Each structure stands twice: as structure tokens, then as C-alpha cells.
Amino acid sequence: RRALLIGSRLAVTGALLTLLARLDHRPDVLISGSAIGFYGIDDSSAIDEGVARGRGFAAELCARWEAEARRAEALGIRTVLLRTGLVLGNSGGMLASLLPIFEAGLGGPVGKGRQMMSWIHRDDLVRLIVAAAADGEFTGALNAAAPNPVSSRTFAMALGQALHRPAILPLPALPLRLMLGDLADELLLGGQKVLPVKAIFHGFRFRYPRIEQALDEIVGRTVKRAAISTRPFVEARLLH
């Protein structure tokens, strides 16, 4: 699994850089994916873009991925390394998997619930990518995370409130470690308190700076979509 994760990211980025080197007319900017896993597990202090690489597999993966992308700088291409937090949206990712569990009233914090979660609403992520592409002041590492990280417990409570469901059943650490091994600590049980210092410095304004705002919007959109999708069925039943 680890070899696949490293190989896929380095191979695709390397192939892209090889292609860019052959072009006579190159793009002005390359925005390369990365993740806040670069910083390792550390929720004891705030993390900005100047913090050094952490320890662990995720940190190694992100560092190697970023190093490959930085080859674009030698080609005269402005390079932005987007260190993305947990992306929240209603059409995929972790939240889409959690929604049915929380809707059934079976949700709760992961582990002890104290680990910090650095997150970003999907719409804000898209807007930040557009801003970074358009503004030449963006270069190097860029934390793509909302300015208000929360604990796993706070996240669970906010999601429960958005769904009008209880969120008091914790997901124990043991089964996660049995399923994922030591990756469980890096991906789910460990935390990071990442702040978007560069984005704010360059004038970017988040539409969803707080977890309650983000989850209320996402849940509302999900409910509206579900209502629209069931309307033809209801109307057909009424006609018969």
C-alpha cells in the first residue's frame, strides 16, 4: 500500500515534469497537490507553512512528492505546493462515508476525541486554487485548511447538530489500528493544528471559516439534493 501511494504520486508528477521540460511554451504556474501530512503528527502547537517536515510515512510521502514538483522551478515555472487538510463535501471523501453513520445516530468522535482536525470546505479549496493560480504572489508551500481547526469531538458534535442526531458513540482506536496498522495513528488518531497563514496574508477570505458553517451548508445541500431526487418518484405515485 505504501509503495503504491509513493509510486503513483511520484510517477505522475515526474511524467508531467518531463512533458513540461519538452514544451517550448510552458505554463506560468504549476499547482501541485500535497497534504498537511507533511508536518507529521503534532496538535500541541499551531503549524504554519514555515514549520519543518515532520516524521512518519505521510510526512515522507509529501516531502518526496513536493521535491519532485519543485523541479518545475528550474524550468521557470512558479510552483505552489498545496498542503491540503481534510476536504469536506457531500459528494465523496470521508464525510460522505460518515453521513449515513451519523444520520443513523451511531456517530461520535474517533478515539478519545482530543486530536485536532484541520479541515477545509470543498468550495473554499476550489476558490483557493483559483486564487493561487491567478496571483503571482503565491509560491512554495500553501496550507489549504480553514483558519479554525477543531478537535475530533467538536467535529462530531457539530455534525450531529447539523443532522439533528446524537453524536456520542466513539469509534475506538483498537479496531482502527487492527485495520490500518500504524497508519491509523497518522491518518485518524493523530492530529494537526494547521493554520492558513499565507492564504490570509495574501488576502484570501474563507466563506466557511468555522466547522458549524461548513457542515450546516453541506448537510443542507445534501438534504435538498435528496428531496429533489425523490420528487419524481413521489409525483409518479400520486398520479397512479
Tell where the protein language model's regions lie, with residue ranges.
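Conserved C-terminal active-site "lid" loop/helix of NAD(P)H-dependent oxidoreductases
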Residues: 153-157, 179-205
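Glycine/proline-rich active-site loop of Rossmann-fold NAD(P)-dependent oxidoreductases
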Residues: 63, 75-77, 88-97, 132-142
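Alpha-helical substrate-binding/gating segment
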Residues: 70, 99-107, 115-150
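NAD(P)-cofactor binding segment of oxidoreductase domains
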Residues: 1-30
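Active-site "gating" loop of Rossmann-like NAD(P)-dependent oxidoreductase/epimerase domains
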Residues: 33-59
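Glycine-rich "substrate-gating" loop/helix at the edge of Rossmann-like oxidoreductase active sites
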Residues: 52-58, 85-91, 112-122
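Mid/C-terminal beta-alpha module of Rossmann-like enzyme folds, strongest
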Residues: 135-182, 216-240
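Conserved beta-loop-beta element that borders a ligand/cofactor-binding pocket
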Residues: 34-35, 67-90
